[in-house]
Amino acid sequence: GHKTLKNNVEDSVANLGPRYCQKVNVRTGTAKYFNCVAKTPAYFERLYRNIDSWLTEKNYRTRKDSNRIGQLESHLKAIRDDFTVALSNLDQRVDAIIDLSSLMKRVESLQNELEEVRHRFYSDYSSTKKDDNVRKELEADEARLLEISQDLYSFTENFEDLKINLANNPYLIIKGEAGCGKSHLLGDVASKRIDDGLPTLLFLGTDFAEETYETTITSKVGFVGTFREFLSSFNQIGTQVGSRALLMIDALNEGPQAVLWKDRLSGLIKSLKDYPAIGLVVSVRDTYFDDVIPDGVETDSGAT
């Protein structure tokens, strides 16, 4: 129950010792990725906000009747309309896949089209000579093109930052140098999630000694049953609250069995794939990364 999860996190945070100092309270850019792994309502709010800000046309001087950019305007409007439909149909359940890739391919094509239009401007400028009206039209088209271009650029940047692949494959590996606040970040996120009533377990690399990680995890939380039964009930809690339960392990590189993670981590991720309402976050010191993290874990297991 909630009490078990709360006790686990409190014990782990206490065991972080001097590495955990609540006053620093990390609110780094990394913290938002935990919402992404867990697919929390806050993640979806950010997703809607980021995309919505681009969907809302800010300029009333669109140039849909322009010979030069009218077609681009109509393609832009079509993509925006389809994005609006896709957002209204977005399935927020933890086991659903977020797939906006075909729309993003169209955005990419639009950017290419925009570059082609931009190239044509140069020849148009040289042929306008002295005709003021033509020149005014050309300048209005160019100003609008710049605006579309800037909006598209910010939108694609914001979209990248949503890390949709991580929301679909909830396995996050945090790599950082010693003392950069990894333990603090995990402790902070775990405590805050528990306060918010979100299912969270936090283990330390040093918790994993002789036994397998399966028995370590089940015995630490006092679960009677197999590891798969434990995952099944943890998964069920995630499904009930409507965002993923998070399993977090800080400092995989610490503890007597650290190098065993090189063989085991892929196996753990593989077993989690059957439980879509569980996300995994692990941290590792950068200097031990290659010793502890399996080769190709990003491509083979979809980890970020």
Please give the residue ranges for each predicted region.
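Walker A/P-loop-proximal flanking segment of P-loop NTPase domains
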Residues: H2-Y171, G242
